[in-house]
Curated annotation (Swiss-Prot):
Belongs to the nematode receptor-like protein sre family. Keywords: Membrane, Transmembrane, Transmembrane helix. The gene is sre-27. One of its GO terms (biological process) is sensory perception of chemical stimulus. This is Serpentine receptor class epsilon-27. It comes from Caenorhabditis elegans.
Length: 364
């Protein structure tokens, strides 16, 4: 939605927030919010479990862990922004006499389709929520580029990368790309970016990270083939062999995350494009929004299933209905089998007493 400030003295005439409000009955909003909160709670559990497994079951170099861990943890920033927006939708937060529970398109040049206000007073939390969502999206997109560069560095420094931390690499990449993410978030928030610019930024970033991933993977696969060749001419150290295998595993994980991310962005972009062309009803935006907010269902699951050790612990963290029914069935079997066991024990006890009674009589 775009907020237009009618105050002529302001230096910020427009704000562009990546959020949606809906012109719905309050009861419908409450029902939808309740369903969303249940789903977000499940996502919260998924994120916590995935982050715990990723950190505890260490399968990669520390530098890779430092860069990838935020992919899971930064979801909390996104969901806080959504909860703030939800409070405005449910009228928990209000702006004086201004009614904002109305659907506004994501981007438009038509002032009639904007939220027109005399000042931004009372909208501070909504603005913060919009910034959080922008920052999340740019952080994830640029984070993928950072991971690709880190794996490129691991391949270039293959001789001693595994034996040393070189922690300055993930720190420098994180600081650099966070500066870019915050800058882009501010530019988008203050309506300095167009919708084409934002989409172009995401597409170019994803394309660059994908290209780097594929190139580095191809190089490492070639090295692996040389190492396994029986007539190889070059001697590879154990550290180099281990680093190549780790690079391949990390690149495979990175590709899966990028494809999951691209799939999420594609779904959101497709629905928003149809909305801008007024081909679908505004209520469909709920699907587009939650494709973003519920992304841990896809991204975390894809990541956890990429490594067998992670997959096992991840599956154990979610007891299925089948397991529950099997446990219930086993409990019933145990209860039913107790009766013959008790009768058998009683019979043995009686037979033992009779035996000792007869033995005692024979002695006397």
């Amino acid at each position: 939605m775009i907020i237009k400030n009618m105050d002529a003295s302001t230096n910020v005439p427009y704000l562009w927030l990546p959020i949606f409000l809906y012109d719905e009955p309050i009861l419908a909003s409450q029902v939808i919010a309740s369903i969303e909160l249940i789903l977000y709670s499940i996502c919260l559990y998924i994120v916590v479990v995935s982050l715990k497994i990723f950190v505890q079951v260490r399968m990669f170099h520390l530098n890779f862990i430092i860069l990838v861990a935020p992919f899971f943890g930064i979801w909390f920033e996104l969901i806080i922004g959504k909860l703030i927006t939800m409070c405005y939708q449910l009228s928990i937060f209000s702006i004086g006499n201004l009614e904002i529970r109305k659907f506004y398109v994501l981007w438009t040049d038509d002032s009639n389709k904007m939220l027109v206000v005399n000042s931004f007073e009372g909208l501070e939390l909504l603005i913060i929520a919009g910034f959080m969502e922008y920052h999340y999206m740019f952080s994830v997109v640029f984070g993928a580029v950072a991971v690709a560069i880190e794996r490129l560095a691991a391949s270039v420094l293959i001789d001693n990368y595994e034996s040393t931390n070189k922690i300055f690499i993930p720190i420098a990449l994180t600081v650099f790309f966070q500066i870019i993410a915050i800058t882009c978030s501010c530019l988008a928030l203050f309506h300095k970016f167009t919708i084409i610019t934002i989409n172009g930024t995401w597409i170019v970033s994803c394309a660059c990270s994908s290209i780097v991933f594929f190139l580095v993977e191809r190089i490492n696969l070639r090295w692996k083939a040389e190492m396994e060749h029986p007539r190889r001419e070059k001697v590879y150290t154990i550290s180099q062999r281990f680093q190549v295998k780790e690079n391949i595993r990390a690149l495979d994980l990175g590709k899966r995350l990028i494809f999951s991310e691209l799939g999420t962005i594609s779904i959101i972009g497709l629905i928003i494009a149809t909305l801008l062309l007024e081909l679908v009803p505004p209520s469909l935006v709920h699907i587009a929004e939650n494709a973003l907010f519920l992304n841990p269902f896809g991204i975390c699951t894809v990541a956890m299933y990429s490594i067998p050790a992670w997959k096992k612990r991840y599956k154990n963290a979610f007891p299925s209905i089948f397991c529950f029914l099997m446990r219930l069935k086993n409990r019933k079997i145990d209860v039913q089998s107790m009766e013959p066991l008790e009768e058998f024990s009683k019979r043995i006890y009686e037979e033992t007493n009779i035996h000792f009674a007869q033995l005692n009589e024979s002695w006397t």
